[in-house]
Amino acid sequence: MIKIDSSELDKFSVYLKTKSEEDEKKIKKILKNSAMTIQKDAISNLTKNGSVKTGHLRRGVANFRRGMTATVHTSNIKYAVMVEKGTKAHIIKPKNKKALYWKGASHPVKKVNHPGSKAKPYLIPAFEKETPYFLKKLEEAIEW
């Protein structure tokens, strides 16, 4: 008859479970801090690169965390990507009216030949700035 003592294996299993729970808490804290840093830097970048007219985009930069996932985004702001990446030259035509008019225009017009807009990145630079720090903190937190 062969008898196998698995008590040490059970102890090791409990250790691994405890260790993984501790690591998960550390990782969640690192994610939270990095998401907040990216959000803060993105808002700062918007101000620095002159993208703030009304403050709507700046107020729309938010972070969201669930479990082991964190996102930094501009929710419900349709023009956010256009500020980040710029636009090509395009024609603007009225959707519901016969002509376009804006404050300061001398008269209504049927279309506008928009020259496009230069990219003013704010979110990607904030992410790229934080990434090395995030990876370093993650490496320090998870001891192999």
Set out the residue ranges of the language-model regions.
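Short, His- and charge-rich active-site/binding loops that engage polyanionic ligands
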Residues: 90
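Short, Lys/Arg-rich flexible segments
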Residues: 1-80, 93-144
